[in-house]
Regions:
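Conserved helicase motor core of SF1/SF2 NTP-dependent helicases
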Residues: 3-38, 42-150, 154-240
């Protein structure tokens, strides 16, 4: 794994990242390859990825976003995740918005830093090329020529999901990732599951919006993660 990350850093140290090489190197399974394929298609505007922990949802999506920024294929990367309710405010917290949300966004920063040095990530944030956009602040905005990355989407409610999906502007792509099994919301309030269900029964052509499901077979972390999930999924009469 360390060797793979070093190779990606070497790509990033050049004037232009070979996006096909750097992203393709991360895709090891059939589902991950399809994930990358949908990211690269210009006519696919929304890529919705559901899957268990450790399947590369965040890493692959963030790698695609940051590579597009460095290669000047987009002007901005917008990152968001449901930290608190859309109706709540951040004013009671000290510091700027990016400082307030730093702890919640560490997994995304880590994924960015696997492609480029962390100093470059900070530079992009300072330049406004990586923008942190809390869900409570996106209503009324439209993101043009951007890659919008949404993490932990299983904790977005139905109203927030609709608001989020209607922010996509000209020459933009939205990547939405989450694990429905780790949802902190009531099932009927789960915006991610709700939209996946709506998409599955929508009668017209919906090629511009794609859903990718990653399973335990796609886990990129150590084998013990898969074993832990197997234990939790195992049903035994002794536990009933």
């Amino acid at each position: 794994m360390a060797l793979k990350m070093l190779t990606m850093r070497q790509f990033a140290s050049r004037s232009k990242i070979d996006i096909n090489c750097s992203i393709d190197n991360l895709a090891k399974t059939h589902n991950q390859v399809r994930y990358v394929k949908m990211l690269k298609k210009d006519n696919v505007k929304v890529v919705l990825v559901s899957g268990v922990a450790g399947t590369g949802k965040t890493l692959i999506g963030c790698s695609y976003a940051i590579s597009g920024l460095i290669n000047k294929q987009i002007e901005k990367v917008i990152i968001t995740r449901p930290t608190i309710s859309m109706n709540e405010e951040y004013g009671f917290l000290p510091g700027k918005i990016d400082e307030k949300l730093h702890n919640w966004l560490i997994p995304i920063y880590d994924s960015f830093s696997s492609v480029i040095p962390s100093t470059k990530v900070k530079e992009f944030i300072q330049q406004g090329k990586i923008e942190i956009a809390p869900l409570g602040f996106i209503r009324g905005r439209t993101f043009h020529n951007s890659c919008i990355f949404v993490d932990e989407a299983q904790n977005i409610d139905c109203i927030q999901m609709k608001t989020l999906l209607t922010r996509i502007g000209y020459k933009s792509k939205m990547i939405i990732v989450g694990d429905p099994e780790q949802c902190d919301l009531k099932q009927q309030s789960n915006g991610m599951v709700d939209f996946i269900n709506r998409l599955s029964v929508y009668p017209d052509d919906n090629y511009s919006i794609q859903h990718i499901e990653l399973t335990e077979e796609d886990i990129m972390r150590s084998d013990v993660v898969k074993k832990v999930l197997d234990i939790y999924n195992y049903k035994s009469n002794k536990l009933e």
